Amino acid sequence: MTIAIGQKQDRGVFDLIDDWLKRDRFVFVGWSGLLLFPCAFLAVGGWLTGITFVTSWYTHGLASSFLEGCNFLTAAVSTPANSMGHSLLLLWGPEAQGDITRWFQIGGLWTFVALHGSFGVIGFCLRQFEIARLVGIRPYNAIAFSGPIAVFVTVFLVYPLGQASWFFAPSFGVAAIFRFLLFLQGFHNWTLNPFHMMGVAGILGGALLCAIHGATVENTLFEDGDAANTFRAFTPTQSEETYSMVTANRFWSQIFGVAFSNKRWLHFFMLFVPVAGMWTSAIGIVGLALNLRAYDFVSQELRAAEDPEFETFYTKNNLLNEGIRSWMAAQDQPHENFIFPEEVLPRGNAL
């Protein structure tokens, strides 16, 4: 028998906190949880409060809460008024001066939800890093989640920072996001932006890869169980492979002439395509924040202006964008006092 004699190490406060945070429990907390849980709770709570009770009458001239008659698709937490610029709109700041009713009226809840939501999604990414390290696996889940973080931060924070105020960010609501998409198309011709094209290719390509991969795995399952369906035929502790990569490779080689030769390259490609799509679209939004133009085919515009018989899909889309601008601007930005001919102005429900 060996007896080790030594001095007991003193455990500091940091070690005690570290042990408590990383204790095995139903919901892991961790150091990342100190950022994630409070921020996520406040962001979701602020959003639910806003769509339930808070009006957008003072910032947008709109009804935006359940209390005013909106439903889940039309309710939103609206952006602050344009006159507020890029102020953080703190409850105790010079705008609200501690008056929570005034803070709701000027749109302070939007900055509250946007900032806490941003830190919340960053905390969730850090949580995946932390747990991956503790479990002993690679951190590719966290790397993949960097895509949604990039999109959220660029759309809700970077884009309005490049514009005149928070007013031009999307409000937190379904119909409000649709309005923002129309705004991006009308004022930035977003659908013709190559970064948007790469983003769409990445997201739809990722969905296609998921569908193909799932179907291929189902098609090549080893029949080593007697149960009637997939979910009962295998045990989670089985040591053998679930499906045949060799058979899958042979199938797709016959379909396309080429196929993935190993699982590592296959799954890395499935990771890369959608994440690259999200990152490229985020880069495109940064360009919009700086009002950079993407594709402007001026030669076609000039020829269409000179020749009434010459028209392309590009020139037709340009006319649609002009219509969006003239229809949206007067209603969406009443503080600018835009004046348009009466025949092109929106006519409410009489359309």
From Swiss-Prot:
Amino-acid positions noted as binding pheophytin a in the UniProt annotation, renumbered to this chain: 128, 141
Binding site for chlorophyll a ChlzD2: 116
GO molecular function: chlorophyll binding; electron transporter, transferring electrons within the cyclic electron transport pathway of photosynthesis activity; iron ion binding; oxidoreductase activity
Topology relative to the membrane: Multi-pass membrane protein
Major localisation: plastid
Residues that coordinate or bind Fe cation: 213, 267
Swiss-Prot/TrEMBL GO biological process terms: photosynthetic electron transport in photosystem II
GO cellular component terms given for this protein: chloroplast thylakoid membrane; photosystem II
Subcellular location(s) of the protein: Plastid, Chloroplast thylakoid membrane
Binding site for chlorophyll a PD2: 196
Disulfide-bonded cysteines: none
Xref: Gene3D superfamilies: Photosystem II protein D1-like (1.20.85.10)
EC number: 1.10.3.9
Keywords for the protein's UniProt record, in alphabetical order: Chlorophyll, Chloroplast, Chromophore, Electron transport, Iron, Magnesium, Membrane, Metal-binding, Oxidoreductase, Photosynthesis, Photosystem II, Plastid, Thylakoid, Transmembrane, Transmembrane helix, Transport
Membrane-traversing stretches: 39-59, 123-139, 151-164, 206-226, 277-293
Cofactor binding, note field: The D1/D2 heterodimer binds P680, chlorophylls that are the primary electron donor of PSII, and subsequent electron acceptors. It shares a non-heme iron and each subunit binds pheophytin, quinone, additional chlorophylls, carotenoids and lipids. There is also a Cl(-1) ion associated with D1 and D2, which is required for oxygen evolution. The PSII complex binds additional chlorophylls, carotenoids and specific lipids.
Signal sequence region: none
Membership in a protein family: Belongs to the reaction center PufL/M/PsbA/D family.
Misc: 2 of the reaction center chlorophylls (ChlD1 and ChlD2) are entirely coordinated by water.
Known function: Photosystem II (PSII) is a light-driven water:plastoquinone oxidoreductase that uses light energy to abstract electrons from H(2)O, generating O(2) and a proton gradient subsequently used for ATP formation. It consists of a core antenna complex that captures photons, and an electron transfer chain that converts photonic excitation into a charge separation. The D1/D2 (PsbA/PsbD) reaction center heterodimer binds P680, the primary electron donor of PSII as well as several subsequent electron acceptors. D2 is needed for assembly of a stable PSII complex.
Protein name (record): Photosystem II D2 protein
Organism, scientific name: Emiliania huxleyi (Coccolithophore)
Lineage summary: Eukaryota, Haptista, Haptophyta, Prymnesiophyceae, Isochrysidales
